[in-house]
Amino acid sequence: MKKYLLYMVQVHLNFRRAELESLADLYNLSIDFSQYDANSPFFIVELENDQQAKDWIKRSILTRGIYEYWGQGTTLDELHKDIQRQSNFEQDLQLKFKHSTFKFEFECYKGNSKAKRVEQIETFRYLGFEGKIDMKHPQEVFTVIEEYTPISENVGGKTPTRIYFGRQVQMSNRSAMEKYDLKKRPYKGTTSFEAELSLVSANIAQVKPGTIMYDPFAGTGSFLVAGGHFGSLVIGSDIDGRMIRGKGAQVNISANFKKYGESSQFLDVLTMDFTNNALRNNLVIDTILCDPPYGIRESIKVLGAKDPERFLGKEDMEIDGEKAYLRRDYIPTKKPYALDSLLDDLLQYSSERLPIGGRLAFWMPTANDANIETIVPMHENLELKYNCVQEFNKWSRRLLVYINRGSTFNGSSNHGIKRSKDNFRERYFNNFN
């Protein structure tokens, strides 16, 4: 086993470990998280080889990169001594890369030193590298990572408190955030999900090539785009046909996939009420990833009559001799629906359609009431794997991730029980008072 240094970002800390664990599980890697510290951007792990490190981190969003660990110290002198104390120093560290082209890089966390970098690099002369320096396309990149204690919240430190050194093995997929930035997307809306957490959600849901991912509340397709990025074939539906159709041939969900060169990953989107799902029963859905409507922009609705008695008989109405509901311009009636009921339907559908081990991941809003317990929906055949919270001012949204364990699992269930305190939409507009 070899030691590797993982360098992570200090954002969305509630999601970071879930992403790392999910990616490790996706590639069948055994990672010891006993030394993981959510408050630190550094995590030293043991892996069998570089390939395992590459597999683990190549699609991660909440890390920066992973490095073959060579040593650490509170000062540069301590670092050099620690490197030379490594049991594999001569055989694996010095000789293996003796003739490789290389370059040095510096990374700084919460500060920056005014030290002369060239002089610092010269202190590593004992490594005995004889290969040429190549700043553009080196075979190896050796990285000095300096950790600082900031002077204040807005002022970084000047002297590093800890220095790490390692060989770059794999940089993360964090650059995908720039590619999928909403500002550059042809088709987006007020409810479009941000690129970073869309991609993180897809990682935790274990969206992968050779599978089908379904978003039953697709909207403008943010999660479909994230699923396509990770190689899944994606299909979506939404009760609002306007969202599905977009604003023309050049401004719709399909146009987004065309812009990213991923049209081959896009199966289709359908105007459909999820609670009256029309997808055939034998369609294999490997992953369900979605952001159900909270009822903030508008109330949650499904197909049906708000007042069934008043609607009675109108279902057979004809226009020009044709059943009204068969016409292309037909707009079906809709009725209000509770968020709790919608989530119950989502869990039940997932238990029926996902394969054993398949994941359901969705976002759920909650109010930040200190004296009220948040009750998440549960299903007897689904294991709640992660409950990741993103907090705002007076409310939060949670990424809930479930694994389908099948009919023999017999977990807890709260189907049909009112879990939400009052109506989330009403409370939102009343400032949660």
From Swiss-Prot:
One of its GO terms (cellular component) is cytoplasm. One of its GO terms (biological process) is tRNA modification. GO terms for molecular function: methyltransferase activity; tRNA (guanine(10)-N2)-methyltransferase activity; tRNA binding. The keyword Cell inner membrane does not apply. Its main location: cytoplasm. It is an enzyme of class 2 (transferase). The keyword RNA-binding applies. Interacts with TRM112. Catalytic subunit of an S-adenosyl-L-methionine-dependent tRNA methyltransferase complex that mediates the methylation of the guanosine nucleotide at position 10 (m2G10) in tRNAs. This is tRNA (guanine(10)-N(2))-methyltransferase. It comes from Saccharomyces cerevisiae (strain ATCC 204508 / S288c) (Baker's yeast). The lineage of its organism: Eukaryota, Fungi, Dikarya, Ascomycota, Saccharomycotina. The gene is TRM11.
